[in-house]
């Protein structure tokens, strides 16, 4: 700090700083310690110098003794210089302490400054008609003197302490004591790795035992009086937490380390060390558990029919379509009857038909190699109708409906063959039909319903939809779709007057006319 800064502050500030400080005691103690260190360095240097002077007269002689003396001479010189530096540091500490003592003695005291303020207050209060003008002026001049004196004292103290700090010597690091020929000799012999490893393990073991010995000593001291020590720790943390943490931090660390390691460390290391023995047991248990797991097989996927039934493309004038239907359980078979019709021109060939699937479970479509195709017919109820498979538009529509229905059901299509046939209840043991018993309505359902509060009329009506077969051993158990009433029992049936015969149906269940 410069002189104008010291001058800017009142003398009370400087006097309070010097009076309330730690005093010169710490500087004097530091000077004493440096003096003792200087004496120790000097004693060590003198002892080592005497030892080096006696080396040539001992058992060592020749170059080895000379190398030994030459290796220690720099260290002896450093000890001598360190002793001088320590003595200089002690002298500078003493100079700083003397400067502080001088500044404190020359600084106006707080009592003098307080007395000056009290006298000034009294003189101003009793200054009637200016009778205290001269005493007030003298008092203010005395205060100005103390102001200037305090600033000057602080300036001198700053200069003296700064000079002592700047002139204090700096001790350099000690030189390494090494034999000049030792480096070459060390390269001759090879280093034994086992000795180096043993030395490293010994150092690690010493560090480990020292660390545990230190912790156990702290814990043992705490266990001598656990209640009293706990109370002391709590009081220390409540009064001064920082100092308590510095004082009792090592003890708390030792306790926490032991608690954590005993609860977590030992089980963890036990599992790690025993893992090679537990691995085969765990592997065996895992394989045994796998043996009891259920095996889920993937469902078999039935490939869809790659080649659907194709309708035969023939000329309409050369081949006449016919319908053949076999009704199982009734013992009748339908025969195809040709019918006259207008033939289209022979020059035009029909377009190829799209793939189509069978429309009924009891009717199997056939290819063109087996003659007229089987399946539902297209047209009205009367006359000879062409099968749907022989008409391109109808075949395409039937194929589209079949594909849509297959996609909705999400089922795999099954391959059908033209030479296969299906018998329904072929082993039921039905005898020859004795007569037309008629069809009666099924007893399932709510029956015929009318208006509320009215009774139904009992009259015979022809059943439509699902019916039950009469006169068999199953009663109304098995069901089958209705077929046209024109399909009578027996193999021979006269042709209808209009020439329609038995082939005039469209293949769909409906009532007979």
UniProtKB/Swiss-Prot annotation:
Listed GO CC annotations: plasma membrane
Alphabetical list of Pfam families matching this protein: PPE, PPE-PPW
Predominant place of localization: membrane
Annotated segments matching region Disordered: 395-446, 469-513
Protein's UniProt name: PPE family protein PPE4
UniProt function note: Important for the siderophore-mediated iron-acquisition function of ESX-3.
Free-text disruption phenotype from the record: PE5-PPE4 double mutant exhibits a severe iron phenotype but secretes EsxG and EsxH normally. Mildly attenuated in vivo.
Membrane-spanning residues: 233-253, 277-297, 309-329
Compartments where located: Cell membrane
């Amino acid at each position: 700090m410069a002189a104008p800064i010291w001058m800017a502050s009142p003398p009370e500030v400087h006097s309070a700083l010097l009076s309330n400080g730690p005093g010169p005691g710490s500087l004097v103690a530091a000077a004493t310690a440096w003096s003792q260190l200087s004496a120790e360095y000097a004693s060590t240097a003198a002892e080592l110098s005497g030892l080096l002077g006696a080396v040539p007269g001992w058992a060592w002689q020749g170059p080895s003794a000379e190398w030994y003396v030459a290796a220690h001479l720099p260290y002896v010189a450093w000890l001598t210089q360190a002793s001088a530096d320590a003595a200089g540091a002690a002298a500078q500490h003493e100079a700083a302490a003397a400067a502080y003592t001088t500044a404190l003695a020359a600084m106006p005291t707080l009592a003098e400054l307080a007395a000056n303020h009290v006298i000034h207050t009294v003189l101003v209060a009793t200054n009637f008609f200016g009778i205290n003008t001269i005493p007030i002026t003298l008092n203010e001049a005395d205060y100005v003197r103390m102001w200037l004196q305090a600033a000057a004292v602080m300036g001198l103290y700053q200069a003296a302490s700064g000079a002592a700090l700047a002139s204090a010597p700096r001790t350099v690091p000690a030189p390494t004591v090494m034999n000049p020929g030792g480096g070459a000799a060390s390269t001759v012999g090879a280093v034994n790795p086992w000795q180096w490893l043993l030395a490293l393990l010994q150092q690690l073991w010493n560090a480990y035992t020292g660390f545990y010995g230190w912790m156990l000593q702290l814990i043992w001291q705490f266990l001598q009086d656990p209640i009293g020590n706990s109370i002391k720790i709590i009081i220390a943390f409540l009064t001064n937490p920082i100092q308590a943490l510095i004082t009792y931090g090592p003890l708390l660390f030792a306790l926490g380390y032991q608690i954590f390691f005993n609860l977590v460390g030992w089980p963890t290391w036990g599992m790690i060390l025993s893992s090679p023995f537990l691995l085969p047991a765990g592997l065996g248990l895992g394989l045994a558990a796998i043996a009891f797991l259920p095996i889920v097989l993937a469902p078999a996927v039935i490939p869809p029919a790659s080649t659907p039934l194709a309708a035969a493309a023939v000329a309409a004038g050369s081949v006449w379509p016919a319908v053949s239907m076999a009704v199982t359980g009734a013992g009748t078979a339908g025969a195809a009857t040709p019918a006259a019709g207008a033939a289209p021109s022979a020059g035009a060939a029909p377009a190829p038909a799209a793939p189509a699937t069978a429309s009924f479970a009891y009717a199997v479509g056939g290819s063109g190699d087996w003659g007229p195709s089987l399946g539902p017919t297209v047209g009205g109820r009367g006359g000879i109708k062409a099968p749907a498979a022989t008409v391109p538009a109808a075949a395409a529509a039937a194929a589209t409906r079949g594909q849509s229905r297959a996609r909705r059901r999400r089922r795999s299509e099954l391959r059908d063959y033209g030479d296969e046939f299906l018998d329904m209840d072929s082993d039921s043991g039905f005898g020859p039909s004795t007569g037309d018993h008629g069809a009666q309505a099924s007893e399932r359902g709510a029956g015929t319903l009318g208006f509320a509060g009215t009774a139904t009329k009992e009259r015979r009506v022809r059943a439509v939809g699902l019916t039950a077969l009469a006169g068999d051993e199953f009663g109304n158990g098995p069901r089958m779709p209705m077929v046209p009433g024109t399909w009578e029992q027996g193999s021979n049936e006269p042709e209808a007057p209009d020439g329609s015969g038995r082939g005039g149906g469209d293949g769909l269940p409906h009532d007979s006319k």
